[in-house]
A protein has these predicted regions:
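Catalytic active-site module of serine/aspartate enzymes centered on a nucleophile-bearing elbow/loop
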Residues: 123-156
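Flexible "cap/lid" subdomain of the alpha/beta-hydrolase fold that forms the substrate-access gate
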Residues: 1-130, 151-152
Length: 156
């Protein structure tokens, strides 16, 4: 997901965050500048991200050490992908009920389709929910929808 005529692909940040410590060095001086843009770019409801909420969300990324810890997730993606490939090669899929929760204005059904096609033994056991008018930040943008969906799934 690089750059297209529509702009950068949705996953551009995966490579950026995982490439050594460049992202940490660039972002650490002004995490508010970067993350305010980043959060709003992936939001379906941009107006809910007030300066106060943004400050609360950005604080955990406010130092270089915190950024390094956070971006460790992206650095581990290569190992995770290799582990998933090995499991799938041995036909190891989820056999328990599973849930995929996404936002309509986020990745919509992209990950749901992938999960259904690759990672679950019985696609009928996958509870797939796309929250309407919601971007990537599900809990901030649609707390009621998340709570309702999780409760329905967990307390069947």
């Amino acid at each position: 997901p690089g750059y297209s005529p529509k702009g950068p692909g949705l996953g551009w940040h995966f490579g950026y965050f995982s490439f050594g410590d460049i992202a940490e060095k660039q972002i650490a001086n002004d995490p508010n500048l970067f993350f305010s843009y980043f959060i709003k770019t992936y939001a379906g409801k941009k107006d809910i991200f007030t300066p106060e909420l943004l400050a609360e969300l950005i604080e955990p990324y406010s130092t270089r050490d915190k950024l390094k810890a956070a971006f460790g997730y992206y650095r581990s993606k290569k190992d995770s992908a290799l582990q998933n490939e090995a499991l799938l090669a041995n036909n190891k899929k989820l056999f328990i009920p599973a849930m995929a929760l996404s936002g309509e204005k986020g990745v919509n059904d992209v990950l749901i389709k992938e999960m259904r096609a690759k990672f679950v033994e019985d696609p009928a056991k996958l509870e797939a929910v796309i929250l309407p008018n919601t971007g990537h930040w599900l809990i901030e943008e649609n707390p009621e929808g998340v709570e309702k969906s999780l409760s329905k799934f967990l307390f069947k």
